Structure formats: C-alpha cells, structure tokens
C-alpha cells in the first residue's frame, strides 16, 4: 500500500472524488504542514498553526497509479490560485501536493510541467509540491462529510463545482 496527501481547499470537497476510485483503501481528512502537533479545526482556521487542510489517501498501486491520483487531484482544484481555493481563502486552503517518496515528487513535478505546457490555463500553475510532513487526523465530524451532510456539502462546494465544470470537463 502507498500513501498520498493532497491539499486543495476545504477537505470536505476533496474526499469524494478519490473515494469513488477503485484501489482506494481510505481517504481521511486532516491537517499537515504546520508547526503545532495535533491541531484542532479551530486552531487551523485561526491561521496561526501553518497547517493546510488536506486528505490522506491510502491506495493500492497495483489497482491505481499515483500518476492517476495526481491527474484526479488537478481536476478538483484551481491550480492557478495560490491563496486558497474558491470561496476558501488563506494559507490553510492553499493547493499543495505533498509527496511521500522521491518517485511521487518526480511524478508530481512532471505532471505540473505537463499541465503548464498544455495551455489549459492562461495563468501559471502555482500549486506547490512539498515533502510530506506529519498528518494529523481531523475531528470525526469532518470525516466523510459529504455523506453525512449532503445539503451542506452541496452548498459549500457550489462555486468549486462550477469552476471544475467550466475548466476540466
């Protein structure tokens, strides 16, 4: 099994697309990249811990390749916005691909270069690619949020879905 970590705005909106793929064993919401061990949602939202909201994905590389996960990641984000994603603003919502191996780093960097060269976006691709840091599991009520709160999920992801439809379909 392998592990992937992606930050692309609110973690509520990042889980479902990955959970729907064959070969995904788990998708967990949490926090990474900061300086405070085991931060709470409130601490991360206060923007004082340095963490980003992210999803940790455990996958079977025999069933789904990391490259495919990176491609799916791009299609969930606005890779030209370094200051958050959609209605979620600030460093805690910035887009980051966290790599857990040097091979993941190579794949992510090549994928980013390919996306930039594709001309899909007029602006530069600013998503960062950084080494994975400790991943702290978010509170239970954040896990599988889209399943537990479908109406609230739909409301909170409307702007994201419009962008994705216009730019990735």
From Swiss-Prot:
| Name of one Pfam family that matches | PMSR
Which reaction(s) does its UniProt entry say it catalyses? L-methionyl-[protein] + [thioredoxin]-disulfide + H2O = L-methionyl-(S)-S-oxide-[protein] + [thioredoxin]-dithiol; [thioredoxin]-disulfide + L-methionine + H2O = L-methionine (S)-S-oxide + [thioredoxin]-dithiol
Its EC number(s): 1.8.4.11
Q: What does this protein do?
A: Has an important function as a repair enzyme for proteins that have been inactivated by oxidation. Catalyzes the reversible oxidation-reduction of methionine sulfoxide in proteins to methionine.
Q: Which UniProt keywords apply?
A: Oxidoreductase
Signal peptide interval: none
Q: What is this protein called?
A: Peptide methionine sulfoxide reductase MsrA
Similarity comment: family membership? Belongs to the MsrA Met sulfoxide reductase family.
Gene Ontology BP, a term: protein modification process
Q: Where is the active site?
A: 10
Q: Which organism is it from?
A: Streptococcus pyogenes serotype M12 (strain MGAS9429)
InterPro entries attached here?
Met_Sox_Rdtase_MsrA_dom (IPR002569), Met_Sox_Rdtase_MsrA_sf (IPR036509)
Extract the GO molecular function terms from the UniProt entry: L-methionine:thioredoxin-disulfide S-oxidoreductase activity; peptide-methionine (S)-S-oxide reductase activity
Q: Which gene encodes it?
A: msrA
Give a yes or no for keyword Oxidoreductase in this entry.
Answer: yes
């Amino acid at each position: 099994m392998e592990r992937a970590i992606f930050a692309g705005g609110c973690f509520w909106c990042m889980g479902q697309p990955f959970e729907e793929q064959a070969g995904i064993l788990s998708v967990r919401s949490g926090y990474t990249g900061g300086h405070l061990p085991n931060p709470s949602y409130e601490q991360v939202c206060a923007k004082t811990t340095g963490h980003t909201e992210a999803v940790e994905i455990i996958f079977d590389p025999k069933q789904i390749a990391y490259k495919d996960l990176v491609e799916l990641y791009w299609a969930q984000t606005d890779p030209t916005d370094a200051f958050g994603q959609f209605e979620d603003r600030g460093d805690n919502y910035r887009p980051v691909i966290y790599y857990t191996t040097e091979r993941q780093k190579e794949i992510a960097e090549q994928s980013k270069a390919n996306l930039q060269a594709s001309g899909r976006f007029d602006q530069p691709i600013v998503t960062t690619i950084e080494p994975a840091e400790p991943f702290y599991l978010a509170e239970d009520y954040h896990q599988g949020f889209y399943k537990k709160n479908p109406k609230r999920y739909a409301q909170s992801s409307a702007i994201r879905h419009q962008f994705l439809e216009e730019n990735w379909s």
